[in-house]
Amino acid sequence: MRFSLRPLIARCTLAVALPLAVVGTIAALTFTTAATSSVAHAQQMPPGAKQPGDFPHVKLTAGMFVIDAAVAANDADREQGLMYRTQLAPNEGMLFAFGENAVHCFWMKNTLIPLSIAFMRADGTITDIDEMQAETTNNHCPRNNGTYALEMSKGWFTTKGIKPGMKMQGLPPLQ
């Protein structure tokens, strides 16, 4: 009787090659999807828009919580705000500083994540807190005049027990 290894080698090659081909295809699709998502997200960012790390930052305290806040203190930065961001770190937010004590309204156009906002007087006293849905053009206005507003991830103020009447510490001087 004659024995040939050729059929056995063919079966083993197929048994190894097929799973490798499937894994390779899945990896290629995953890479293509990730690259496409990054490109699509990058295309949404308008020319001249600041990246998150390009804003000046301050450390604020609300009760026992330390907040890393990007500061938007000029018209261009306030207009961009947190637009185009897809996430925030747990205690990350954006502080809007205004040169005048007035009612400053916000909307969520091109803002991809839902946010909470606290409106404050110059001394850091929180006057109003509001919840804002992503990608809407509804106005969110405080009932009181103020000079600062702090945007955080949706529900942040509620879950931390931060309420109107409490004070925010570490606010930068107004210009």
Sequence positions of predicted segments:
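Short, amphipathic alpha-helical segments
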Residues: 19, 26-32, 59-60
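Compact, glycine-rich, soluble single-domain proteins
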Residues: 41-175
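Intrinsically disordered, low-complexity segments enriched in Ser/Pro/Gly/Ala and basic residues
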Residues: 3, 36-37, 152
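Boundary at the C-terminal end of the N-terminal hydrophobic targeting segment
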Residues: 28, 34-42
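Bacterial N-terminal signal peptides that target proteins for export
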Residues: 2-25
